[in-house]
Structures are given as C-alpha cells and as structure tokens.
Curated annotation (Swiss-Prot):
Lineage, top ranks: Bacteria, Pseudomonadati, Pseudomonadota, Alphaproteobacteria, Rickettsiales
Swiss-Prot/TrEMBL GO biological process terms: translation
PANTHER family xref list: 40S RIBOSOMAL PROTEIN S15A
Keyword Protein transport: no
Function (record text): One of the primary rRNA binding proteins, it binds directly to 16S rRNA central domain where it helps coordinate assembly of the platform of the 30S subunit.
A Pfam match: Ribosomal_S8
Keyword rRNA-binding found: yes
Coiled coil: none
Alphabetized UniProt keyword annotations: Ribonucleoprotein, Ribosomal protein, RNA-binding, rRNA-binding
Name of the protein in its database record: Small ribosomal subunit protein uS8
Length: 132
C-alpha cells in the first residue's frame, strides 16, 4: 500500500510516540522530513534525530524530549497543508499560534523554517504544520 502523505505519517508517529511515553521513534526519512525535524530541534521540541540507512532505505530516529516531571514537549502537532488542499499564507496573515507559544512550520523559497524565522526574513509560503 502506498502512502499519499508522508509528512502526515511522520507527524502521527511523533504524536503517538509522545502519547505512549516512548523515548525514541523511527520512520522512513526524506528531505522534507529532515527539514521539518531540523526546525523542531532548533525550536526545542525534540532532543535530537539521526538518519540511518537500512536496505537502501533511509530512516530517521528521533529522540523525544520530556520535561523533568515527564510532560511531553509537544502537546499538539497537526498537519495544515494537505495533498488535496494546499494552504499558502503571506507572513503578515499568520498570527501567532497559541499566543506565540506554538509555531507554524512553513516551506518557503528559502527552505523550511518556523514562522518566527519567516517573520524575520519577511517571507511566506506553504504552511506545513502547527506545533504547540
């Protein structure tokens, strides 16, 4: 069975791993997925990730981040732009997610970045997902 939305699959695996209190989660890797993981790591939502090769397929293994009392660093992670309905936004139209406590991850002409970085560079793009 082929997958139509690989990014949504990655986000679902991360969400389910946090709900199950897992330490690590792995899934097939791609350029867009590693770009999203870079943003999540830079913003402090995950500890680290490593890409490995097994049987000519690259996998990403993500080390999830929890607080001292065991709370997940990601409460919500949702896909915004889907294959059937792409969502594009100018940076001025994006308001802060959860009063600037969460982030939007955008795919811009300058690469994948958070809405905070996009505000600094004054560039909009496709809204991939939102994280809180």
């Amino acid at each position: 069975m082929s997958m139509t939305d690989n990014v949504a699959d990655m986000l679902t695996r991360i969400r389910n791993a946090y709900k199950s209190k897992l330490i690590n989660v792995s899934f097939p890797s791609s350029k867009i997925k590693t770009s999203i993981l870079d943003v999540l790591q830079k913003e402090g939502y995950i500890k680290d990730y490593v890409t490995t090769q097994k049987n000519n397929i690259s996998y990403a293994e993500v080390a999830l981040k929890y607080s001292v009392n065991g709370d997940a660093s990601i409460c919500e992670i949702h896909r915004v732009s889907k294959p059937g309905k792409r969502v594009y936004s100018a940076i001025k139209a994006l308001k802060g997610y959860y009063n600037n406590m969460g982030i939007y991850i955008l795919s811009t002409p300058y690469g994948v970045m958070s809405d905070r970085e996009a505000h600094i560079k004054n560039v909009g793009g496709e809204v991939i997902c939102k994280v809180f």
